[in-house]
């Protein structure tokens, strides 16, 4: 099967078309802007899979309709999914702009005095606004000399933020969300909304009953040699935690082995269903070998599967991690309980950062007073205003233990292409696998148990769908918190100590839903959330604007908010602008 090519970024150098000295004097400077932009993006950004981003530059500078059409023909043949137009001078606005309505686009107008790059930028953006095709504006804060080929820091920040978000949009388009099962325990996010995926993300939904997973396991529609490798890997690396089940529910060694085997098979088969596996074709299973072209998936599990078969905890945790028996690799995106909306938040985070994502219940708000009452100890430092307990039995990536280290030796979660095998092993060593609690999971299973290291910056997100409004995005930047061991043990024991825990302290800004930690919890729109490494809320905001998803809650500094220029015409309140613009333009792929 032919591999689907990755989207590219097209660079469009536009120029004043007047000959007899004007165009000729600008050719080199204009093309050099395009080359510098391409070099910056190629150096600084990778696709979520780890591949280097490829930029395609128009063959000539673009002065009018003919050269614009020639550029578009080239881009169409090379899978260009995002465009950046660059110029140091005046050009002919609507004659030179990118008119593809579904392709994210930005314009960098050079801030210089010799030629009016800012004037073209304003004219072109006016054309975009009038035609209903929003574009992002890039204009340096400080004037540069005409022969200055450097890219200022503020311009670089906008170029890279736009490129990251634009590539996420282009990478999701044409892919599918694999819904394995249906609605889990009445959770609204697992009522998978096909219109949302199609109209806002440009994706399809592939709905598959959980009996397909059962069929693949029972009929050995998997790589049997790989199963043996996975079992050997688990035997070497899994540490098993306390079995908290009553004696009548404890399994013997043979039963536990069967649960482990089926859990690993679930991981293999869900992966094969998502992306395909050519080994199956070698076994004569050509249809099954193709997969469903899924960039994200969800597994219902509870309760129609878990009342009889091992739960999805092990499979989900391993798939969402950056490593398994095959070594370090790109993490998958698999949502527990088929919560497709949390799965989309995971997908956004992975596409923007290349890292694994932590799926969690937004379980409990602990006030400083409640913590002191229960433990006799006071919260301090990052936790002084209270904490939120993020915990779930299922698909928290093992990277979430934060045993990887950044360039300063601090705990983090790295893009998979930066993770060493030693760091992967450290995450495994920090994880215990605890037998599932029988009352919840009658078919058994193993839940991963780890504790996220403290002081790590995270961004918590969630997508919700509001009837009459559509999808909205919530964002809360903050930090993981390390509690004294005795305090952690007491608080953890009050819920389920066999599950992975992250203690989270959102950054407070003294107003709205970020007045205090309680308000963050009270304003969260659903029972699940996602943690993405770093304070990357600004990237989420830019991505959401491209997709026309308004942001209903965030604590990102206003100076970092980057949306299309047309948003400014939708009122003076920056968040009201977002709602009005998203309503005005409608979903990116509306029909």
Swiss-Prot record:
Q: Where does Mn(2+) bind?
A: 337, 361, 528
Per the record, the pathway is: Carbohydrate degradation; L-fucose degradation; L-lactaldehyde and glycerone phosphate from L-fucose: step 1/3
The molecular function terms of the Gene Ontology recorded here are: arabinose isomerase activity; L-fucose isomerase activity; manganese ion binding
Coiled-coil spans in chain:
none
What GO biological process term is on the record, naming one?
Answer: L-fucose catabolic process
Q: What class of enzyme is it?
A: isomerase
Q: Say if the entry is tagged with keyword Isomerase.
A: yes
Listed A to Z, the keywords are: Carbohydrate metabolism, Cytoplasm, Fucose metabolism, Isomerase, Manganese, Metal-binding
- State the reactions this protein catalyses: L-fucose = L-fuculose
Offer one Pfam family short name for this entry.
Fucose_iso_N1
Which terms in the GO cellular component ontology are assigned? cytoplasm
What's the EC number here?
5.3.1.25
According to its UniProt record, which cofactors does this protein need?
A: Mn(2+)
Q: Identify which residues the record assigns to the active site.
A: 337 (proton acceptor), 361 (proton acceptor)
Where is it mainly found?
A: cytoplasm
Q: Subcellular localization, per the record?
A: Cytoplasm
Q: Which family does it belong to?
A: Belongs to the L-fucose isomerase family.
PANTHER family named in the record = L-FUCOSE ISOMERASE
Function, please? Converts the aldose L-fucose into the corresponding ketose L-fuculose.
Q: How does it assemble?
A: Homohexamer.
* Annotated protein name in UniProt: L-fucose isomerase
Organism of derivation: Salmonella typhi
Lineage runs: Bacteria, Pseudomonadati, Pseudomonadota, Gammaproteobacteria, Enterobacterales
Primary gene name: fucI
